[in-house]
Structure formats: C-alpha cells, structure tokens
C-alpha cells in the first residue's frame, strides 16, 4: 500500500510539473503573438528576396537559424549579390545591429541566472523580443525564466518559418510584395503603445523620440540610430535620480 501511494504521489508530481510547463508555454505564446504576425510576414519578404537573388531555400533556412539578425539579413542579400568582402560585411553588421549592445545590458544579469540557456538568450535577443520581454509581467504561479526562454525561442521559430515559406513560395509564385516590410513598423507601434499605457513614467519614451528626431535631422536615416541610442543612455544615466528607470521585477 505504501509503495502504491508513493508511486501515485510521484505520478501526481510529474503531472503537476507537466501542467506548469504547459502554462509557461501557453502564456509565452500569447505574449509572442504580435511578433509572430510581424516576423512571419517579414521572414517571407526576406525569403522572397533571397530566392530572387538566386539562393535556394536552404540558404534562407540556415541564415535564419544561425544569423537571425532581422534587418541585417535583408542587407546581407545585397552584400552577397554585390560580392562584398568579409571586413565590409562585419562593419555593416556593427553599424546596423550595434544597438543590441544596449539591449543586452538591461538583461545580462537576468540571463546569467538562466544557466545553460544564457548563450541562447543573448543570441536570440532581437529588437522585437527585447520589447516583448520588457513588457511581460509574469504571473506569480509561472516560471519567469521559462517564459522568457519560450518567448525568445518562439520568436526565432517564427522568423525561420517565414523565411522558409518565402523562399519556397518564391520558387513557384510571382507577386508584388511592396509594403510588406511595414508590418515591422506596425508591430513596434503596437508594442510602444502598450508599454506607454503600463509605464509609470513616460520620460524615457519621450526622450527616445526626441533623440531619434534630432539625430535623424542631423545625420539622416542611415546613421542616426547609434548616436540616438548613445544620447538616450547618457541622459538616462545623468537623470536617473530624478527619473528612475523602472526595473524588470524578478519572479
């Protein structure tokens, strides 16, 4: 009888663990839906461009799995077709994706606590994933680390799926994809509005918009992003006592 009760408790514990993992995944999936809508369409656009440049869907699959750089992958198509060298490609990558350095700083301590998942969490931190993670408030009965991982992993899968669909479809279907890249702009607008509604202080958002506009007018659309981010960081550090930055609470 004792043995049966012990086995029953073990089975119940396993079922409870499975249910908790399921709840973590379902919650993460719901949080990632806005990114899914943007990433699949943008991934399709990237796959179409890559296929149109003469590369098979295997290139779309591998680049999305290994590189996973969003806008840089679009630039990569131009670099590949133009025969750009490795050094020039590295410089372009730094200028385009250098902003991720700033994103990682706010999550590095949290990701370190995730153990073996730490390298992947750093690798998978894109613009959109960062925005979703910042706006996610994990319920007390869920594991925040697991939720964050699933959000990052699902976003990665959406991009891979869209890229492969676009590359395969481009082999058989010809259509005008003009304007499809606006889905990413729309995605950011939705995320910003949601964060604006939930934030206690709107100073960081106003500062970001102001710095972006100023540097855009000074340097133009191709060079304004990194200076704008640097300016925001400096101002936020200087004014951190008067306008404290809301921290992401751990669970």
Q: Each PLM stretch: what is its role?
A:
Residues 1-26:
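Short, Lys/Arg-rich, polar N-terminal cytosolic tail immediately upstream
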Residues 12, 16-17, 90-181:
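Helix-loop-helix junctions within the multi-pass membrane cores of secondary transporters/permeases
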Residues 20-22, 27-122, 136, 158, ...:
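Pore-lining transmembrane helices
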Residues 44-48, 75, 132, 164, ...:
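Alpha-helical transmembrane segments of multipass membrane proteins
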Residues 238-250:
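Membrane-interface capping segments at transmembrane-helix boundaries
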